[in-house]
Regions:
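N-terminal amphipathic/basic-hydrophobic helices that include classical n-h-c signal peptides
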Residues: 1-24
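PLP-dependent amino-acid enzyme catalytic core
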Residues: 12, 22-167
């Protein structure tokens, strides 16, 4: 039994590719034209492809249990940097860690963990995403985006000011 989309629904097929031996660079393609390819900095700078498509990674990195276990004792910014480094290969892990510490540090979040997981009762936990400057879950992304966008402009040689509007 499969899923059939109702008439009028626009469903995209994801075009994930197998990572070639020795390949480490992640590219992003447009959901409207797989021939449109770019690196992470260009994708972050653009937001959407020029053809109106979403920019999607060409592959999903494989994460094993050992990788996840190595994240357990680390601070939130380190976890964010390690995971983002799998997708943003044109940024160094050191850059991502700096961005993460700027985005999720005590100047921005009122909890030193940024996104703590609290036990509610046996077998039930709550991920608290309201400790940021606006007390909304979107702070998790919107504190990091300006750092990534500013770096993307530098990496692509653009000298302009970017404005991020969020609702």
């Amino acid at each position: 039994m499969g899923f059939t989309a109702p008439s009028g629904w626009n469903i995209w097929k994801m075009r994930f590719e197998k990572q070639s031996e020795g390949e480490s660079d992640m590219k992003y393609y447009s959901t409207r034209d797989a021939a449109v390819r770019m690196d992470a900095a260009e994708a972050i700078k653009m937001g959407l492809s020029r053809d109106g498509g979403l920019l999607t990674p060409t592959r999903i990195p494989q994460i094993d249990r050992a990788f996840l276990e190595r994240l357990i004792p680390t601070e939130y910014a380190q976890r964010a940097a390690k995971v983002m480094a799998l997708y943003l290969t044109d940024y160094s892990e050191e850059e991502l860690l700096t961005f993460g510490r700027n985005a999720y540090g005590p100047a921005q979040f009122d909890d030193p963990i940024a996104a703590p997981v609290r036990k509610v009762e046996d077998g039930l936990y709550c991920l608290e995403l309201w400790h940021g400057p606006t007390s909304a879950f979107k702070d998790m992304a919107l504190q990091m985006l300006p750092q990534l966008l500013s770096a993307a402009l530098r990496k692509t040689g653009e000298k302009r000011t970017a404005c991020i509007l969020a609702a």
